[in-house]
Amino acid sequence: MHKVFIAGSIKIKHLDAKVKARIDNIIAKECDVLVGDADGADTSIQQYLWEHAVTHAVVYCSGPMPRNNVGSWPVRSVDTSYAPGSRAFYTAKDLQMAKDADFGLMIWDSQSTGTLSNVIELLLLQRKSVVYVNKLKAFKNVRDAKELEELVALMSDTAVKKADAKIRLFEKIDRLKQLQGDLFHA
């Protein structure tokens, strides 16, 4: 059974009908859903899964207890030595979800470095993502560095600079290009 890592920007509190339809497809295929415990998109995803009586979901959290678990699903607690509440602390669960997933469905506001980081981690593990870009009301497939660059092009200059400062965005894109052999095709 496929495992789908579904996540999104913390600022996104409501799921678009197109995202719900995509989640409906995941539910119909009885894929295992891996979801985080954050407020925002994670909680909205959990709520939608609960409303559809999904039983094949796992809530991932950093540390011993999830912040949110709407459906009382099994919990995958990820141990981390980072300070509770820090960015690195919460990133630990995202990294584990990327490792455990076969592919990702991301809901993105064209700013969130956490969601963008999830897409990158999946790519580094040779897994693709389907990213719903909220401002476009459209899905973008991200299967390689080129498609990641197309996604990044949707960000404002300020958001790109912030992402580079927070997650070393350009360094990660270059790493992906090297891993995928894109540098030899430039």
Q: For each predicted feature, which ranges?
A:
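Leloir-type glycosyltransferase catalytic cores
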Residues: 147-186
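Active-site donor-nucleotide binding/catalytic segment of nucleotide-sugar enzymes
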Residues: 6-11
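Extreme N-terminal starter segment of soluble prokaryotic enzymes
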Residues: 1-4
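Acidic/glycine-enriched connector segments
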Residues: 12-153, 157
